[in-house]
Amino acid sequence: MKERLKNFHHSAVFICLILAIVLDVVLEALGRHSLFKAVEYVWDQPLIFLYNCSIIFFTLTLSLLMRKRIFGYCVISFAWLILGITNCIVLGFRITPFSAIDMLMARNTITIIDKYFDVWQIVLIAALLFVALAGVIILFIKSPTVTGNIYRTRTTVFIVATFFCVMLFTKIALNAQTISDNFANLATAYNNYGFVYCFSNSVVDVGIGQPSDYSEDKMLEIKDDLDS
């Protein structure tokens, strides 16, 4: 029995790995509006592609703590696909790719959504979101449950180790200038470094930090100097 559970755990990790690779190819195809360009990117930038896969892989490993692992795989994969599809749609209206700041501005986006979509398109999007939500609920109910010991402590250690590996890969890639965390042009960065890394970076880095000497009086002083 222990051997079977061990083999299942290993197969679960393998599933996470395969899903990560497939998801990254799909996300790049959506962002580039071309499967051919996505494959070309994988061929030209294999290390960056694998690095992006490692980020997705880490998120998928969280499902290993769940007894309903298939549900976990699907929800996490669905979340990435939603981000990728949103990026694909956004790039149809503007040059700048989808980033975390857009999510923070979601309330403002709702007020102007009619400027970008027709009524039938808005209704279709709402219907698709409803179907997706219903699908998630049904999947949770119907998906099989892992029985027996899922080794939470060992699995948690593995997930934490995976996280630190991703952080280490990031540090090495930055030092080697394989990737950059300073995006002069967001569209170029997404094209060169991949959607997953760039979007993840936008979650962590939401803009320029506030200077230590910043204050309202300081801003008024600068304004007076400019006006004089």
Question: Where does each model-flagged region fall?
Answer:
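Soluble catalytic regions of membrane-associated enzymes that act on cell-envelope
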Residues: 173-228
